[in-house]
Amino acid sequence: GKTSIVYHIANAHSQLHGQDGIAIISFNDNRLGAWPQLQLLSASAGIDCFKIKNTTGLSELVANLSNRKLIIIDTPSNQIEENIGAIRTAASHAACHLVFPADVSAGTIKRFLAVERAHWQSLALTKLDDCLNPWAVIQMLAENDIPLSFAGARSALENKAEVAAIINALVGRGIRLLAPTPLTQTAWAGATLARTFAGAAVR
């Protein structure tokens, strides 16, 4: 899920910035088990993690960590407007990234895209193998200038071929769920759609 994506992003950047150059902050997250999981993953990567519950504490912690090259702030999916506001107060130039399961609903996507202060920089997808309905996220990638940056436990997606492969897999899965189409036709249709908007999904 999202906490695992945070770990993979931090781990992917540790070679560039070093473990001591990265910090992870869990902000205003009361999900059961989320903090212990983040602590465990951070410890396995040798990266410091912190837990903060309010805007004042977040601002103070970000200021204290100003020497770090990368600070990752993990927030829950509820109270998104308030959380983004707190992040903008603590770190006005922070880049905000979406993390969705591959079968996220259109309603959830709409709710997050409506948060104008976020200025979403990219999308990371989770639960690719368990996806039952990828069409909402496919439509989102086609209609919005938000690049796909991470997919599951993969390293960062850095070129169009990698993005197209992920989109092709999602489209193929969606087509198979809609109708019992022959495999060759499914693969062809998915590849065609992937080529159509893979360029819009990566910068």
Regions found by a protein language model. Give the residues of each.
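Conserved glycine(s) of the Walker
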Residues: 1-2
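Hydrophobic positions on the alpha1 helix immediately C-terminal to the Walker A/P-loop
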Residues: 5, 9, 37
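Conserved beta-strand/loop subsegment of P-loop NTPase cores
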Residues: 21-23, 93-100, 116-159
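Switch II (G3) loop of P-loop NTPases
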Residues: 22-33, 40-86, 90
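Amphipathic alpha-helical transducer elements in NTP-driven molecular machines
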Residues: 32-35, 52-59, 81-84, 106-110, ...
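Walker A/P-loop NTP-binding motif
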Residues: 10-15
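NTP-binding/hydrolysis catalytic cores, primarily Walker-type P-loop NTPases
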Residues: 141-203
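Conserved Switch II/interswitch segment of TRAFAC-class P-loop GTPases
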Residues: 76-80, 92-110, 130-131
